[in-house]
Amino acid sequence: MTTHSGPARHPAVVPDVDALVSRYVTPGTHLHLAMTMARPNAMVYALARQFAGRGAFTVSTSATHTAMHALTMSGAVDHLITCFLGDTYPTPRPNPLYRDLARGEPFTCELWSLLSFTQRLTAGATGLPYGVTASLVGSDLERGLAAGGRGPLPGGDGGTADGTPKFVRMADPHGTDRTFGLVEPLRPDLTLLHGACADRRGNIVLVPPAGEGAWAAYAARRGVLASVERIVPDAFVDAHPERVVIPGQRVVALCEAPLGAHPQSLRGLSTGEATQDITGYRDDYAFLTELVESLATEDGAKEWYREWVEEPGSHAAYLRKLGPARRAELTLDARPLSPRAPVTPPRDPAPPFTARPPRAAATPRPRPEPRTPVSRQERTVILGARAIVQRVTEDGYDTLLAGIGVSHLAAWLAAARLREQGVRVPVCAELGFYGMDPEPGDVFLFSQLHATRSQQLAGITEILGGMVAGNRRCLGVLAAGEVDSRGDINTSLLADGRWLTGSGGANDIATSTDCLVLSTASPRKFVERVAYVTSPGARVREVVSHFGRFRRDGGAGSPFRLATWLPPGYDGPATPQEAVAQLTRWPAPTSGCVPEPEVTQAEVAWLRSLDPQGFYR
C-alpha cells in the first residue's frame, strides 16, 4: 500500500522564462513543446540561450517551425519526434535547416502524422500500454516507425534504430479487411506550454483553438512548465472554473511572459471585467517573413539567431526590441473585424457567381490590378474549387477539411460558391477550426482572424478524429510536393535526399476519407512514382492541375484519366495530349476529356480579395 502525507504543494512562481528553464530543465531531458495556437516560444528561446550546444534533448512537438528553428540552430536537440519540419508562412515550404534530415542532420528524427501523434499523447495521458490509430497504414511513415523510428530515413544513413517498433500493424479481430495500428504511448519528462493566464495555484486557462489540448500536460512524467500572459488572483479562476484546461496539480512551475507566444498568436480572453481581460495578439507576419528570408542562407540564419536569441538575453529585452508600436499593432480584437454576411437562399436557382466584396482587414494591403494575368497557381485553385463544388453537389459531402496551401484557398473559394447556391458546407482546419469564414486579406490558414470568424473552436482530436476519420461524408482537400499515377502523395522526402516538410495532418486525412489533391503540373511534381509515400492514394478521387482535372472512374487503384481541359495559356501545350505528355509523367488517357469553362473575373477577384499580396501567385 502506498501512503502519502503532507499538504498539497503549489507550483513555484519564478521571475521569468530563463529562470524557469534553467532551474527545472537538465540536459538529456525529454521535453514536449505543447501544440496549441499559442506555442511556448518565449521558453523555446530561453532553452536555446541556456542550453546551446549542451542540451542533448529529446524534443517532441507536432510541428517544427518558427521559434523552434532557434532551438534547432542552438544545437541543443539530439533527437526530434514530430510531424512537420519547415515553414508555414507566407506559404508552406521547406526550410534549409532540415535539408539533410535523411542523413541525420541536424538531429535524428522520428516522423508521425498529426492525429497519430496526438493519439500517442492521449495513450500516455490515460495510462494505456498502446494507442490505436487508423492512420499511417501503407505509408513510408509506417515503414520507418515499424523499424524503430529513430532513423535512418529512406535514402539516408543518419541515426541508429533503437530496435523497438513504434508502430505495429494489426488485423481487424472481427475479420474485415481493415487494418489499423498500435502506437507507443508518448510520455515526455516535462511539457512546456504557454497559456492565457493562471493563478498561483497553477490552474492554467488556455483559449481555443486547442490544438492538442491538455493531453501532453497529463502525459508528462514530471509535469508542466508554464508561461502565461498574466498571473491572476485565485478568485478569478474560482469564478471561472470552466476556463481552466490544465489543473494546478500537473504544474511544476510557472512565470509570466507577456507576448510569450510571439511571433505566433494568442487568442484573448474577455471576462466582462475590463481589468481582468487578457489581450490577444495576431501572428506577426512581418517577423515571420523576415525569419524565412533570413534562414534562406547560412549567414542570414546566424545573424537572425544573434539578433533575436543571443543578444536580447531575456524575454523582457526581446519585448523591448519589438517595441510598443509593434506590440500595439498586433493587438487582436476579441470580436470579428467585420460581421459575417447573412446567408439567405438565393432567389435565382442558378445565380451567377459574384465576388464577395472585401471587408476591413487588420492591416490595409494593396490589391493587385484586376487585369493582372492569372497565374498557374491561381488557375489550380479555381479548378480545384470547381471540383469541390461538383463533388459536394453530386456526392453529398457535408464537410471540407482544408490542408494548408493552395488546398485551403480552393476549399474557401468552393464554400463561398456553394453558399451563393444556398448550400452550407463547413470548412475545417486541423488545429481546431470548424465552420471557417475567412477574413479577406489574410491568406494564412491558421490566422486568429479566421478563428474569430469560425462557428466552433475545438482541437485536433475533434477535427481530424470526429469530423474527418469518424465522418464518412467529409471531403479532404490536400496539396502535394509530388503526386503519382496511383494517387500517392509525397510531402516529405525527394529522391535526391532533400527534405520537404512532412505529413502534418495530410496522412490522417488521406487514410480516412475521400480526397482531392491540388498541384500545379510539371514533370517534377506529377511523377511516375513518388520518392516517399507520405499519404497513400487509395482514397484520392481527383487530382487537379492548372490545365485540367484528373479523375478516377472506378474505386481505389483504378487509373486516372484527364477528365477536363483548360488550355494553360500562350506558353503552354496546345492539346490535352500534349499537356499530359509535357507536364506530367503519367500514362493518363485523354479520351472523353471535356472543355473546362474559362476562368472568370469573379473567381479571380474573390481569390485575390483573400490573397491581395499575391503569395499564391
Predicted regions and their residues:
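Conserved phosphate- and dinucleotide-binding cores of soluble alpha/beta proteins
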Residues: 2-23, 35-50, 67-371, 382, ...
